[in-house]
Amino acid sequence: MKGYNPLHMKNQNKIQLFLVDDDALFLRSLEIEFQQHTDFVIETYATGELCIENLSHNPDVIILDYILDSLEKKAMNGIETLDKIKAVNPDIPVVILSCQDNIEVAVDCMHHKAFDYVRKSETAFLRLQKIITTIYQYKKLEKELNWYMDRM
């Protein structure tokens, strides 16, 4: 995958969002929350492997669970999945979601180039919404800056 097109908006102004979590109930509730906002096209995956297989769909943002082994103990965990995503396309922002309330886990995720780390809680969706808005605004400004730089 060459040349990440920041928020390419292939469905008018909708953000392509991948949700990756092995907890089907949490994944579905997150999907429902995001579906209530018309600016998202959502794809959900229960494993990191499925997410990697579908990176050709060019997600704008990936929200990725940290553990990912409840369906199959040999499944890739969130960090392994993050590393593979970054190997394919280092420009895709990946937000790690976890039940872990441990600063070392969050720091480890950042060392693996996660955009941010969010603890699963009642406020996780609101935090994710703010993070995605920040990503969107940053990519929009980056796109505008590149446009102006090309004309200089």
Each model region followed by its residue ranges:
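Conserved phosphotransfer cores of two-component systems
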Residues: L55-H57, K84-D91, H112
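Two-component/phosphorelay signaling modules centered on CheY-like receiver
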Residues: A24-A46
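Receiver (REC) domain switch/output surface
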Residues: R127-K140
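Acidic, metal-coordinating helix/loop segments flanking the phosphotransfer/catalytic sites
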Residues: T44-V61, D65-S70
